[in-house]
């Protein structure tokens, strides 16, 4: 399949996976079969010959903003949330390596005994060698979401596109789980996402993507094989761009 790489529009991609996606039907933590399916979807894209990076959230373990609402110092809460992303990254790495996928975890918060520190040149070199790079620790700064981290890392790695895996198959004008008449956008501009206060990503992340002309594609992680389909312009998704 790697011989088809020249026919693909996107050759270097970053996948954003929320922590909640790793829970499956659980209320907390990880569901192995769900993580295995995600890893299999990633392998399918690697087999196409693409360079792949991942940013993983931590909401299945800890949400800093929620802790701040009940009285914890926001910066401290966010740092704990960053540690949760490292736990998720190591879990995903373990499952991916069990499938024969060469994987490296790079953390914005140095943890030398468990993973590599984030160094841009090293991360790019790993990707050139067709290793999957999982970026953990968010941006390394409080008050920043993992969506912002995903946009920043995608730009730093010179990725062609950012793919955001969610619980729904695209961007809607309201929550389709609550509103059966919600309208789906097949394409939408950065400006309209911001002006319409759509909750697909935080405003800061969308603004940085717009400034750097990074296209974003939103799709459902629930359907097995969707990652490879979406990167080949197939399946259901919404593209955010100019």
Curated annotation (Swiss-Prot):
It catalyses: UMP + ATP = UDP + ADP. GO terms for cellular component: cytoplasm. It comes from the Bacteria. InterPro entries: AceGlu_kinase-like_sf (IPR036393), Asp/Glu/Uridylate_kinase (IPR001048), Uridylate_kinase (IPR011817), Uridylate_kinase_bac (IPR015963). Its EC number is 2.7.4.22. GO terms for biological process: 'de novo' CTP biosynthetic process; UDP biosynthetic process. The keyword Zinc does not apply. SUPFAM superfamilies: Carbamate kinase-like (SSF53633). Pathway: Pyrimidine metabolism; CTP biosynthesis via de novo pathway; UDP from UMP (UMPK route): step 1/1. UMP binds at residues 58, 78, 139-146. Keywords: ATP-binding, Cytoplasm, Kinase, Nucleotide-binding, Pyrimidine biosynthesis, Transferase. CDD domains: AAK_UMPK-PyrH-Ec. Inhibited by UTP. One of its GO terms (molecular function) is ATP binding. It holds the Pfam family AA_kinase. ATP binds at residues 16-19, 59, 63, 166-167, 172, 175. Belongs to the UMP kinase family. Homohexamer. Catalyzes the reversible phosphorylation of UMP to UDP. This is Uridylate kinase. It comes from Rickettsia prowazekii (strain Madrid E).
């Amino acid at each position: 399949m790697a011989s088809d790489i020249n026919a693909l529009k996107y050759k270097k991609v970053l996948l954003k996976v929320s922590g909640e996606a790793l829970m499956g039907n659980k209320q907390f933590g990880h569901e192995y079969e769900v993580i295995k399916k995600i890893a299999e979807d990633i392998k399918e894209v690697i087999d196409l010959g693409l360079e792949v990076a991942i940013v993983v959230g931590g909401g299945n373990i800890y949400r800093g903003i929620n802790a701040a609402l009940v009285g914890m110092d926001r910066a401290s809460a966010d740092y704990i949330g960053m540690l949760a992303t490292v736990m998720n990254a190591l879990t995903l790495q373990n499952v991916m390596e069990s499938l024969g996928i060469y994987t490296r975890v790079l953390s914005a918060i140095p943890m030398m005994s468990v993973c590599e520190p984030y160094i841009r040149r090293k991360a790019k070199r790993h990707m050139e060698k067709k290793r999957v790079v999982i970026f953990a620790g968010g941006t390394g700064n409080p008050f920043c979401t993992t969506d912002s981290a995903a946009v920043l890392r995608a730009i730093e790695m010179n990725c062609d596109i950012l793919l955001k895996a969610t619980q729904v198959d695209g961007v809607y004008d309201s929550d389709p789980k609550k509103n059966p008449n919600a309208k789906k956008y097949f394409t939408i501009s950065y400006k309209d996402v911001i002006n319409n206060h759509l909750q697909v990503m935080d405003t800061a992340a969308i603004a940085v993507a717009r400034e750097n002309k990074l296209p974003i594609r939103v799709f459902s992680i629930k359907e097995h094989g969707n990652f490879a389909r979406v990167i080949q312009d197939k399946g259901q998704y919404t593209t955010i761009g100019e």
